[in-house]
Swiss-Prot record:
Belongs to the PsaL family. Gene3D superfamilies: Photosystem I PsaL, reaction centre subunit XI. This is Photosystem I reaction center subunit XI. It is a multi-pass membrane protein. It comes from Prochlorococcus marinus subsp. pastoris (strain CCMP1986 / NIES-2087 / MED4). The gene is psaL. It holds the Pfam family PsaL. The chain crosses the membrane at residues 108-128, 165-185.
Length: 199
């Protein structure tokens, strides 16, 4: 400990609170005090969780609740598989058509490899979210999602979701690569490539 730290700790050790400002009637073990700040009810305007026509409308609720992340009755692994397949399939196009090798013969393969690399990075981030020391955050029910999946927000559920995401992402990228490589798209591919050509 340096001289400055020692002198600072010695000067602050003598600080005492005035007894007239201490409320001894409230103890940390009181149930009412401990729980009153942890409860965040749905549609509380003080927290900003409002039921608006957008987030509580029929179309929005039907759309959000049918996404693989919130759909009822499927396992965390299948949730990850379906989400990863959508990511891999949709990321393949921008990587192959706008990548640095877009004007070469290797554009489709480079797009596949870049997409698989991006899926690996996203999978690594999902693994870090489930790092030891804290469990994944459990989403409370709100105006849009009444019943969030409880099995997903455990350590094993999130690990299953992550492994399914990796497999689905790589599989979706390979499926998009196979579709683009078919003979039916040979007439369209030069047109699409020339849209983003800069030279």
């Amino acid at each position: 400990m340096s001289d400055f730290q020692k002198s600072f700790s010695e000067s602050t050790s003598s600080i005492k609170f005035d007894e007239k400002y201490i409320d001894n009637s409230v103890q940390p073990n009181d149930i009412g005090i401990a729980n009153q700040w942890a409860v965040k009810p749905v549609s509380d305007p003080c927290v900003g969780n409002l039921a608006t026509p957008v987030n509580s409308g029929y179309f929005t609720k039907a759309f959000i609740n049918n996404l693989p992340f919130y759909r009822e009755g499927i396992s965390p692994n299948f949730r990850g598989l379906e989400t990863g397949a959508a990511f891999g399939y949709l990321l393949y196009g921008p990587f192959s058509m706008t990548g640095p090798l877009r004007n070469s013969d290797f554009a489709l393969t480079a797009g596949l490899l870049a997409t698989i690399g991006a899926v690996h990075i996203l999978t690594g981030l999902l693994v870090l979210y489930n790092a030891p020391g804290k469990a994944p955050n459990v989403q409370p029910p709100d105006a849009t999602v009444y019943n969030p999946p409880a099995d997903l927000f455990t350590r094993t559920g999130w690990a299953d979701f992550t492994s399914g995401f990796w497999l689905g992402g790589c599989g979706g990228a390979v499926f998009a690569w196979l579709l683009v490589g078919t003979l039916h798209l040979d007439t369209i591919m030069p047109i699409v490539k020339n849209i983003w050509t800069t030279g």
